[in-house]
Structure formats: C-alpha cells, structure tokens
Amino acid sequence: MSYQTVTFGKLNRKRNMNKRKFFRAALGYCLLLPLASCSEDEEIIVPPDPVSYTTLVYMAADNSMDSEVDYTISQLRQGARRSAGTAVVYVDREGETPRLFSITQQGGEVPLKSYAEENSANPETLARVISEAKELVPSDRFGLVLWSHSMGWLPGGYDSDLVPQGTRGNAVDGFPRTRYIGIDNHPGNDSSSGVMEIDALADALPDDVAEYIWFDVCLMGCIEGLYEMRNKADYLIASPTEVLAEADYDASGIPYAKVLPYLFGGVEDLEQACVAYYGHYNSMGHDILRSATIALVDAAELGGLFTATRNVLQGRLHDMEALDTSVLQAYHTDNVPNVFFDMGDIVHTVVEGRTDEFDAQLRRTVVYKAATPQFINKLSISQEHFSGLSMYVPLSRWKGNCEYSYYFNNLEWSGIYE
C-alpha cells in the first residue's frame, strides 16, 4: 500500500535584464499569496484511492495508559491522511465514558457511538465493539489493533515471587515507562475482572474475526498467547518484550503516523508496517529509547509449530523443570515476571541437536522479526538467539503458583509435553 506526497522546496531563479519589468509587476501579486505557500519543504499529501478496509484500534485506556491517548490519536490522524482504508477508534479513558469514532482521510473525527461507563477489559465488550464497528463502517476487509497494558499470557493473579526480591517495583516510576491485555480501573456495573486474560479473549472472539491482529501491548509475542489466538486472524503481530509508553519522546507503541498506511493491504504491507515500526525505534537519538522488538506471525503455521515443538519436547517436562534459565535469552526486565525466554533458545538448549524440522517450521511461522541490540539498557538481545517469540519454562519451583496451574489447565500450548 503506497501513498503519494508532493514536496515544495526553494526554486533558484536566474533573472535577466529583459525580465525585470515582469518580475516587478508580479511582485505585488506574489505578496498577496499566503505566506505558507512560500515555506521551504512544505509537504502536501495526496491521499491514496480509498479501499474497502477498516482497521479498529481498541484502546483500553481507563488506567495509567490514559496519558498516552492524545498522542496516539494525533498519530492516527496523521497516518489516516496517507491511508487508503478507514481507521475506527474505540477509546475508554479515565474520567470519560467510552466512545467510538472513525478518522477521515483529512484527519478529522466522525462520531459513531457513545457508551455508558463499561469494562473495556471484558472480552465480551471487545467482541461487541468489533461487531458494532463492522456494522457502522461496513467494508470488505477488517483489521484489529489491541492497545493497552499487558502481561502476555500471565493471568491477572500471577504470584509475586515471579519477580525476584530486590527488583520489584512499579515500572511506571522509572524511565522509560512501558505498557505492562487491557486493564480497566472503572468497569462501571460490570462485575467481571478488570484484566482481560488470553484464554477468555480467545473464547470471546469469533474465528476469522480479522485479517490481522496487532497487539500494541507488552509481552504478547509469547507463543502461549499467540497459539490461543491462532484461529482468530490470518496474521498476528506482537512484541516478545515490553513496549515503550513515552509519548513525550515520540516513543509510545506503534508510531501510527508511519505505520497506519500499511495496515490496509496484504502480508507484504504488514511486513512493511513492522519494518517501519522497528525503524522508528532503532533510529531514536537516546540509546535508552532505542528499544523495540517485533514479530509478524503467520497464524496458519502455528499448528505446525505446535507439532514440531511437541516432537522435540514431548516427555521432557522433567528436563524443563530443572532447566538453568540463566543461560537463555530473556525478554523480561527487572520489574517483569521472570518467565519470558526465547522460544528457539529454549528448544536448542534442551534438545541439543535434531532441531532441523523445528527450525524450518519456526522460520515458516515467523514471517518477519526484528530487535534492537538493547532494551531500555536493562536487557541485551542477541540477534543469533532472537527467534521473535518467547516461551514459558515451567520450572519445578513454580509448582503451586496460580500461573503454573493456569498454564497447564487453561492454555493449549502446554500440550507440547504430553
């Protein structure tokens, strides 16, 4: 999906004596033109021809992410001016009731619906909003972006001992902040959880609900969560690490001004969207903000990846329980539960050879991947060991924890050991 821009710069004019009278006469006319027309390097955007494609950006921001909302919507407005499809936004923020609106190619808002206070972290709310967006803005194709906090596949009540003593703290207090699917501090009359758990999300969404789902949240590049979502979209996009949330530094989730134009095409466009995402962060002037990971996953290949992983790990749960995780590529920082390790690195460490089938399937599954060498100066990422996906190691010391039970009782991926 391409877009056009027209750029005006300075014109170097050569005057000759015979043309002086003309230019003097024209000068008075030129001075009447708006000053903006004489600015250097002014960009006039020529919008692409519209296509029948809607992307819903679902912003569960009734939490500390409220501070990032204005920046994100501004970015979406900029991106819409270069986009062929239609961006629809649902936003639930602190101190306001939720609303649904579309963004025009001129960057304006068109109100679609207003809501009473509700729990945007309830997956049934998400499913309803998707249905309403499709009804109010009908189109041939549909994409979905989930925007909020996240702890990956972990359930809301994960045990505190997953974060070692001495490293615990509120990540929001530090710099840069990150987006720890969807927390809602004011759920209205909804008595359901204020956290959207991945198995409940998968149950609530119909199969083939979108062509792609982009998780603009932390830690959702985990194989456990993506496998649960394998039937919901053709492609899944996520980060195995945290995602920055520093709007003041132009470093907050997806840079929609650059990425949105690519979210209305096919897989090649999605790959270009990921390239733009990575390039945005990799070019940051501050090293601490040069922090991003991204993976584009072909959901149709996830079943094959389950089989290939099971072929090498079946019956090896005991080996996993005793695994020395200190040698693995990790994707968690100090304040994040220490359970996010590189999937490929785990398999290669445990199996020690005989991984050709697994490696080939992993390459088919992860269409595109990229990672900066460092993440917020706390985490080194080896390009050699970066597979694009994280995976849980069910260590014996986690037995008895609620997330250990949740993993084996609720997540289908745990079947790789059976």
Segments predicted by a language model, with ranges:
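Bacterial Sec-dependent N-terminal signal peptides
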Residues: M17, F22, L32-T54, L395
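Short, solvent-exposed loop/turn and secondary-structure capping segments
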Residues: E68-V69, R99-F101, L154-D159, G225-L226, ...
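Surface-exposed loop and adjacent secondary-structure segments within mature catalytic domains
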Residues: D92-P111, L146-G188
